[in-house]
Regions:
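Glycine/charged-rich beta-loop-alpha catalytic/anionic-binding loops adjacent to active sites
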Residues: 15-25, 59-69, 193
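Short strand-loop junctions, especially beta-strand C-caps/beta-turns
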Residues: 2, 68, 180-182
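ATP-binding/phosphotransfer module of carbohydrate and carboxylate kinases, centering on a glycine-rich
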Residues: 16, 34-44, 84-193
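Short, active-site-adjacent cap segments at secondary-structure transitions
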Residues: 3-5, 32-34, 53-54, 184-186
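Short beta-strand-loop/turn "lid" adjacent to the catalytic site in phosphate-handling enzymes
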Residues: 1-25, 37-38
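Glycine-rich phosphate-binding loop of actin/hexokinase-like ATP-binding domains
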Residues: 40-95
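A short, structured active-site edge motif that brings together acidic residues
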Residues: 24-32
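Acidic-glycine-rich active-site phosphate/pyrophosphate-binding loop
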Residues: 9, 50-63, 132, 187-193
Length: 193
């Protein structure tokens, strides 16, 4: 999607190749989700899928976050990244034990944390977003580490929506908030609080 105004230039070859009319507009997919949930297009949308983004529209302006996991809520990638960081903090004795360690080791095929972290550091091992539903499962089962991570990502999304409402000048008015993406639709009660 279009995250930056300059991204529209990237689509010029597509317009030409598809012989689209010269007035064709490209928008960020978050704006499409906003209109899908709010036919007037007025309101906010919080996307929490593989990545994350918050967008909103008032009657006079449209705004969106960067969609870069910088100072804003991310999606499954951020959840998994925080899980990796938490497991490292357990390894260093900073955090108490959590089932997150065993989950990460099992999913990545490692018997011990030292070998796992060596593979992360030296072999470029990366965790994938496929781990996110399992982190949700651990949180739902009561694992404190997973609860903390899930709550952190969800809280950031809520903060982003509040900031978007303020920037749009909609504070103090009823605002429709659309939630889209796999994390929002997973029915994880802890994330949804």
């Amino acid at each position: 999607g279009i995250d930056w105004e300059s991204d529209t230039e990237l689509f010029a070859p597509t317009i030409s190749a598809l012989a689209l009319p010269t007035g064709t507009s490209f928008i960020n997919d978050s704006i499409a989700a906003l209109f899908a949930g709010s036919p007037s297009g007025i309101g906010c949308v919080s996307i929490a899928g593989t990545g994350g983004k918050t967008s909103g529209r008032s009657s006079t302006k449209t705004l969106q976050t960067m969609g870069m996991d910088l100072g804003e809520g991310g999606g499954a990638g951020q959840l998994v990244s925080l899980a990796l960081d938490y497991v490292a903090r357990i390894y260093h004795g900073i955090e108490p034990a959590s089932s997150l360690t065993q989950l990460v080791l099992t999913e990545c095929g490692y018997a011990d944390a030292t070998s796992f972290f060596q593979a992360v550091a030296r072999d470029g091992l990366r965790l994938t977003e496929d781990l996110a539903p399992k982190i949700f499962d651990l949180a739902t089962a009561g694992d404190a580490g997973a609860i903390g991570i899930v709550t952190a990502v969800a809280s950031q999304h809520a903060t982003d929506v509040i900031a978007m409402i303020d920037q749009l000048g909609l504070a103090g008015t009823p605002v429709q908030v659309i939630r889209a993406g796999g994390l929002h639709t997973a029915a994880c009660e802890i994330f949804d609080q």
